[in-house]
Amino acid sequence: MNKPSEVKPVALNVPDYVKHSGLIAWVERIAALTKPDRVVWCDGSQEEYDRLCEQMVQGGTMRRLNPAKRANSYLACSDPSDVARVEDRTFICSEREEDAGPTNNWAAPQAMRETLGGLFDGAMRGRTMYVVPFSMGPLGSPIAHIGVELSDSPYVVVNMRIMTRMGRKVFDVLGSDGAFVPCVHSVGMPLAEGQQDVAWPCNPTKYIVHYPETREIWSFGSGYGGNALLGKKCFALRIASTMGRDEGWLAEHMLILGVTSPKGRKYHVAAAFPSACGKTNFAMLIPPHGMDGWKVTTIGDDIAWIKPGPDGRLHAINPEAGYFGVAPGTSEKTNFNAMAMLKANVIFTNVALTDDGDVWWEGMTDTPPAHLIDWQGQDWTPAIAAETGRKAAHPNARFTAPAAQCPSIDPEWENPKGVAIDAFIFGGRRSTTVPLVTEARNWVEGVYMAATMGSETTAAAAGQQGVVRRDPFAMLPFCGYNMSDYFDHWLKLGRRLEETGATLPRIYCVNWFRKGPDGKFVWPGFGENMRVLRWMLGRLDGQAGGVDQVFGISPAYGDIDWTGLEFSPDKFEQVISVDLPAWRAELALHDELFTQLAARLPEDLPLTRTAIERRMAA
């Protein structure tokens, strides 16, 4: 039997149109390490996509859905052990531990390289290594960047075709010496000769590793979502945030939307919310009854890359080309535009299958179907669910859909120059304390709001606060460097723009989730959030009033347009009030965060907290 070192090198099959010698040498190195049976260079064509989908249907990874119900759409169901991002197996391997900071998992880069070298040795044996070139952002945009992912998963290839600008055109932009982020991914399940594959190969040992200084990503053991689609959180946030730190721009966990007034004035807003706070719903918001003439358009629902433009303003692109959204809870009531987007050309993962070859998930309809095949391939009925509590779809079940199919897509969504941002919005899920909406008085106060935002991880009992998980800027799992340095980067960027005379975006903090004495949400949310958005835009134009609070500026009841909605002043008081004892407790919690981050914390943040305390004492 041949020793591994004696294995005949695999043919690289480099296409004539690939001219980048550094890229070719890297592919050769990784192929020598991982030892795939063959190497395929992906061109991003429809024919390639269809062929790989059919290959996965034959292999049991995917199921073709009823074309009369969901044209050209598929359902994939993962291994039950491989269903979500694995934060505890996600590492930032900066040269110095302090550059990763206390909120990231750090490992020494040299030791990690040795560990991964052992795991990746022969990891693709029996499989195909796909070379997946992709652009994050419109091809050739000054805000865009290129990556190349080497993966042994055809599921990754087809998802990357939807989620990024993937294929041959990327090599034209890359040329012979262009910069790219190298991404290496393996499901970690090599096949011996004659060994039968499984429907969803993965490995109990998982690593998602980032090397900030060399801009590399290595992922082992998972075929799912952000662990395997390395353009998404790994590149577009963790690596890109470090690039932004070094180059003077921002990579943010933010939606981007356009808002056009009845008079034709257009605004652009970027908003950051942690998971389960309605980011995709807000990105695709439909103005409610009574707000005729207003229009909301979608540029992105998850990630924004933001760079200072020649005009001194901050310009943003959505670096993605698709939506990788959470399915459960999505319905025509909660997100009509998303449901319209999902009618064709979609890959669903870990949702349930109906008897007529369509998909279903919790929250899609008021009444579930009488019978389903659940995400684990088992029979499911409402009676079984009532008896066992078993969900038909996994709570983190996903859809992958082309952005161009979104009915509310903004005509500027692929503008290579990006769109100029007028306002930033930050929000969490809090049943008490945090008002419906607050405007920061200045950039520093806005950074403070974003740095201290959080969401309750447990349902709050009546009169009690839930356990609050701080999620600064909604970036806690995604910031690729020290969180204190990240705050400082925001502060410095604001100062630098102010010094040039630029108009900075206003910063707002929102909370749709305040509860009343009955434990129910007071604010109706969804489309009605447009009323809050309209107040913000009125503030930008100097047309809307506001009331000074200890913590920023909030609207009075009369400052909100209530046309078409019955919402009493008493209810409004429940969602806008500032409870001083609760805020004293809140500031103590802010202190806990600042203590954790004390080593490099910018002094502007404790000074802002002190100013809030002074106003409370006045």
UniProtKB/Swiss-Prot annotation:
The active site is at 277. One of its GO terms (biological process) is response to lipid. Its cofactor is Mn(2+). Binds 1 Mn(2+) ion per subunit. It catalyses: oxaloacetate + GTP = phosphoenolpyruvate + GDP + CO2. It is found in: Cytoplasm. Mn(2+) binds at residues 233, 253, 302. PANTHER family: PHOSPHOENOLPYRUVATE CARBOXYKINASE, PHOSPHOENOLPYRUVATE CARBOXYKINASE [GTP]-RELATED. This is Phosphoenolpyruvate carboxykinase [GTP].
